[in-house]
């Protein structure tokens, strides 16, 4: 009976949708979705920091962080559900798929912009100048000196955004006087005297910064956002694959067969009855030896006979009277038989 229960349990546990396989798939899906959620938060944080670092450079790729984060959040909820698990995981896979596409696009845009449009050589050479924000009095002086009349209404609205004139020596020994707004890092080496054609293809001014060191931070943030988007791209593909394999699994408990086998032997009325071995062992009388000790003491009763191979006379069919048991001889000794669980009577001489 115990062997049959063990075999039935092992056959049930070998099913692909058993409880052990379900828990293992659930644990793996939760691990990958939590990891994707952490990466999504990093993408969102770094992307927002890169986007808000300057006013004229807004290419930080934080959109994949929002989409991947929402998809991974749905995946965590769906992995812990039983009834609506499939619907939640399908929605999670859809959002993660869109997030993977957005991460691919933002990784290309941020990487190309950081490599092609930001030149750090003038910054490292200290050839870029930071222009602080001008006060209202200085702005009025600049505007009045430039217009030589009372400032108009449009000019008065832009007092706090008044620009300063910065002299930048050009390659042809000429001087350019660009007008630069306050809180701006300006690089003369990247400015082409007002022409739209840039020398090295990089930005020559970065508006609304606290110092020129913010440009170096912006460069590092863009490359960090690019790397995180690439990580989110591959991790999103892996997460979608894991959730796709888990959405169709249901927990199934192993069914135990508790039927008890009949231990009593079946008796057939048309066949010879079989006697159990233990019955014959306990109830059959013990086998006696052919001769007892008393027989060997009175060996004269049985005369010796020559071997059968040395006798030339034919043996008679009927035994001789000398070989019969004498009536005056005592009976053969047979010890009394007691069952194994019965106590023998006390000894009496």
Swiss-Prot record:
Range of residues in the leader sequence: none
Biased composition (Low complexity): 316-329
One Pfam family matching this protein: FAM70
Matching InterPro entries: TMEM255
Record membrane topology: Multi-pass membrane protein
Keyword Transmembrane helix listed: yes
BP terms from Gene Ontology: response to bacterium
Region listing for Disordered, in residue ranges: 303-329
Annotated keywords: Membrane, Transmembrane, Transmembrane helix
Membrane-crossing segments per the record: 30-50, 57-77, 89-109, 226-246
Subcellular location: Membrane
Keyword set includes Ribonucleoprotein: no
Highest taxon of source: Eukaryota
Any single GO CC term annotated in Swiss-Prot or TrEMBL for this entry: membrane
Family named by the database record: Belongs to the TMEM255 family.
Protein name in UniProt: Transmembrane protein 255A
Source organism: Homo sapiens (Human)
Gene: TMEM255A
């Amino acid at each position: 009976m115990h062997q049959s229960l063990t075999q039935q349990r092992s056959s049930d546990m070998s099913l692909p949708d058993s409880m052990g396989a379900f828990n293992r798939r659930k644990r793996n899906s939760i691990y990958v979705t939590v990891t994707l959620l952490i990466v999504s938060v990093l993408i969102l944080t770094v992307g927002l920091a890169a986007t808000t670092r300057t006013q004229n450079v807004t290419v930080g790729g934080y959109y994949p962080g929002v989409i991947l984060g929402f998809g991974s959040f749905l995946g965590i909820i769906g992995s812990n559900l039983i009834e609506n698990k499939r619907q939640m995981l399908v929605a999670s896979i859809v959002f993660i798929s869109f997030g993977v596409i957005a991460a691919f696009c933002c990784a290309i845009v941020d990487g190309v912009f950081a490599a092609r449009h930001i030149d750090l050589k003038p910054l490292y050479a200290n050839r870029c100048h930071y222009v602080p924000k001008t006060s209202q009095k200085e702005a009025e002086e600049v505007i009045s000196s430039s217009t030589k009349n009372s400032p108009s209404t449009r000019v008065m609205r832009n007092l706090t955004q008044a620009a300063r004139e910065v002299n930048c020596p050009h390659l042809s020994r000429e001087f350019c006087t660009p007008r630069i707004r306050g809180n701006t890092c300006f690089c003369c080496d990247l400015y082409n005297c007002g022409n739209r054609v840039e020398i090295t293809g990089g930005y020559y001014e970065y508006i609304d910064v606290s110092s020129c060191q913010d440009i170096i931070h912006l460069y590092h943030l863009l490359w960090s956002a690019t790397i995180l988007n690439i990580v989110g791209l591959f991790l999103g593909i892996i997460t979608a694959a894991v959730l796709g394999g888990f959405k169709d699994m249901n927990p199934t408990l192993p069914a135990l067969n508790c039927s008890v086998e009949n231990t009593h032997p079946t008796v057939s009325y048309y066949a010879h009855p079989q006697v159990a071995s233990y019955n014959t062992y306990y109830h059959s009388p013990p086998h006696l030896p052919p001769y007892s000790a008393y027989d060997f003491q009175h060996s004269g009763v049985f005369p010796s006979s020559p071997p059968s191979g040395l006798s030339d006379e034919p043996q008679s069919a009927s035994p001789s009277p000398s070989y019969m048991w004498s009536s005056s001889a005592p009976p053969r000794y047979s010890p009394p038989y007691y069952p194994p669980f019965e106590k023998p009577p006390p000894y009496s001489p």
